[in-house]
Amino acid sequence: KELGFAKVSEEKLAVAKKIRDFVIGGGFMFAMCSATDSFDIALSAEGVDIAEAMFDGDASEPNYQSKINYNKTFAFTDFDLVRSPITYEFSSIDMTSKRNIPKTADYFSLIEFSAKWDPVPTMLTQNHTTLVKGFMGQTTSFDRETVKTNVLVLGENKTNREARYIHGTKGKGMFTFYGGHDPEDYTHRVGDPKTELDLHPTSPGYRLILNNVLFPAAKKKKQKT
């Protein structure tokens, strides 16, 4: 209320819209885990009360699913929101509860691109291997059926029909979404000790994060005429 919002949900929507405007204006957004789908859900539900009473003090709107506007999202479409407040899930975007993959077989593959024709995805997928260990998160990976057709899949588990690492454009800017929480802590939970990065100097999963950290510094060379 000190910031001028009646409810926390309104404040969170305002933050999501600020990020949206930053990207549309030419900025770059990198998000992981639940920062990916929750961001798109917030944008899609602008003007619609989807929060139950225990979260914001009043009931959600009746039939709110039918009022979701997928045209407002960055990456996802045709997803269903999870209504139950006791279910640890936001929507049908996330594959965590749908996947049946043991840790020993949990990997995703990076798509190979041409540096000449696709410089941006080539930079974002640079790695010493094309096979990357999977890892869990509140949002582990994305159901391919909910990924918009104009969004580029950079990494996927094709057998399981899940996208793990995606990239797209919005306005003058770009975004990258990466499912999962910590590439070197398979089931990192709240309260767990932090991962010692020095122990994983050649982590393929961390390399993808680094690619996105360094990406905004990459400048296009002027073409000779």
Q: How should each PLM-predicted stretch be described?
A:
Residues 1-38, 212:
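Short alpha-beta junction capping motif
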Residues 7, 20, 27-31, 123, ...:
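Conserved aromatic-histidine-acidic binding/catalytic patches
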Residues 17-19, 55, 141, 163-166:
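Generic recognition of flexible, low-complexity loop/linker segments
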Residues 19, 95, 223-225:
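Mature N-terminal, pre-catalytic/accessory segment of carbohydrate-active enzymes
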Residues 20, 36, 46, 57-61, ...:
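Carbohydrate-binding surfaces of carbohydrate-active enzymes
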Residues 23-28, 40-51, 213, 217-218:
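Hydrophobic/aromatic-lined pockets within catalytic cores
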Residues 32-152:
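An acidic, glycine-rich "communication" segment
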Residues 49, 146-225:
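Extracellular ligand-binding/catalytic regions of CAZymes and related secreted enzymes
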